[in-house]
């Protein structure tokens, strides 16, 4: 039951064990499984209430709790009840507190806050902070909020006294800022000032304060932080603390003054000077240099299209930003935020090998493959079809299928009940990961384009009924927040969602079952419905066209006529020519993506038509077979033209590099940067080589 | 701003800011889940107010008799949140848990003998070198193995401080002499 994540089965099995062998352990298992069912999405509302009640009625059979984990289990069951009284009473009971358990302590505070029992919130938080001497910000925050809600002089005084006593600790100082933010803007400003004066030298100072500072007078705050920038000797000899204050101040400028045309220039000049600083020279190789954030800010400022002192032509913007970031990367090998952006931007301009280099430097592995591999592998089959990184990413899902159920069983056996729900969800999220679905599809497409064997790559069409889970992290990219669209702007097409996966699964299934008429029709109908009824925002235009073309092919397979084949040929060629139009200015992921889909669609079309002719043999009308031959020839001609254009692009590469180097070198922004650690011409040449590799693979495809 | 939170398996999707650091190992699923299954209260994280994980501790409890101890398996803090006391917060909580409910005699950890930064940090926390485990960290192809320092801090139960010693840097043992 654990292997198949069948919570109903777990509950039934546990219940049977408990009734047949009334051991304490089996009663606990029954309670756990009832709880899992009650919080799952496989039960009805009535069943949810039923299993909650059942679990709570079984609790007395295992009391008193013998371990903290059993106490956590009881608390989780009590959480399901309609009112919180029993839960709060249990969590605040001294017998429960004696477990000294973080999970119970967290639940206690959460439950008290939700209940609005502010006196208890205040007292509990005070105990945590003052009596137990545990410096927990959540306790600080809730205590401050409770004091405000209560408006009680005694408690307010106690809070203020503790804040003053602990004002030199980070949590204490920040709690002061939070408390002030509940009072007034003036109080917030003074508290934030105090915090920055004492902790502005920490890298986290900006993140700690930014949400409060946004409500303040921007110019007043910026003037203050600028005053904090001091150097004992000079900027060129800045210490780590001095660099941190400087960079934090610049981050506030980034946040609060988005119209400053001189921002990029200033950041670049500051970065140049800091390369001789003690902070940079003395850092360990495995440490990050915080000064890199000056470059990252400059890069994201440019990418966002914010004002600059000297404008950058659109065609050169991404390459300029790449140069900035490569400079930072060459000086600071382990800065992952720089490398993530470089991975993304190289892919954005279709230079996969350069993206791969930076991605490999990040040493992403195991669970990270599910969460972060999209930075490299989004639409990889249509940017630069590549096998090895794609296949190695799939290992995590095989591992999950074996390891997670095994450890869920271990959790039942060891009584680590606080972990069951989390592990089950973890296993499900990996098993149903949309990234997994994407990679399954992409593996098949890469194999097709590269002419590899397709055995073992079959996709079960039942998978399209999966409720795909989103685990990917899009916000780790610097400058990307839920409110910002920067990551969105430089993404490799719209986010591929479950709809994308389902559509492509259907496509692959139709291709696999092309010669089995009833199955082909069934899946073609399903694909047609999907295209008509689902939200198709996750598909690019050319992807939609390719799916529609496959549906037309399916119709041909049903009833091929001379006219039908001729119409198909016309629409196919029109689409191919439309989407394969060569961009003269600069290559991009979009162009490669369109080209590869056009060529892949041509491949599938020709293979399908050939298969039909082979099946028909001599039975079919000779004119239809002849029209199919004409269609194939027309398609081949377009593909040949595409390959020829790709070849011409490759041959123009040297000129492209020279022109690009000349244009980029004349950009004022670049002239300000100390690029002594990189070779710009070599970098641009490598960009070109990366793009050429994709062009070479394209030209080598066999239709 | 730091809040301590218990760690759950689904948090493994949220540790990127920590685990993208070059010094932080990304273990396979089995490793993380085995710790959650066996020592759930010794696996916890710190979060900022945006709910982002800024650091975490993977600990365990092992040993027999007077060797019953807590152990720091993995302590990792995101680059942006270093040098603000998060490591201290995480280690303190592990010590707290190791005393109650685990009632351990001491806490220990292994650190590369060349890692002066980590050694200095743990000494500030009250740890001392108990012994040098020769060749503990295997180099590639078995060459260039590096020694580890087994650093320890006695807990309340060890009233006579039997779990620590002077001059541990020169007390050499082989890896096979170290209990699992």
Regions found by a protein language model. Give the residues of each.
Chain A
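Compact beta-rich and alpha/beta scaffold cores in large eukaryotic transport/transcription complexes
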Residues: 267, 273-281, 285, 349-445
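Short coil/turn connectors between adjacent alpha-helices in alpha-solenoid helical repeat scaffolds
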Residues: 2-7, 36-48, 213-220, 253-266, ...
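Internal alpha-helical scaffold/solenoid segments in large eukaryotic proteins
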Residues: 1-18, 29-33, 68-161, 293-297, ...
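Long, acidic/serine-threonine-rich intrinsically disordered regions with weak helical/coil propensity
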Residues: 176-298, 307, 406-416, 420-423, ...
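Residues within HEAT/ARM-like alpha-solenoid scaffolds
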Residues: 5-12, 22-30, 42-53, 65-69, ...
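Extended alpha-helical scaffolding regions
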Residues: 389-532
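Solenoid-like repeat scaffolds
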Residues: 16-25, 56-66, 90-101, 126-135, ...
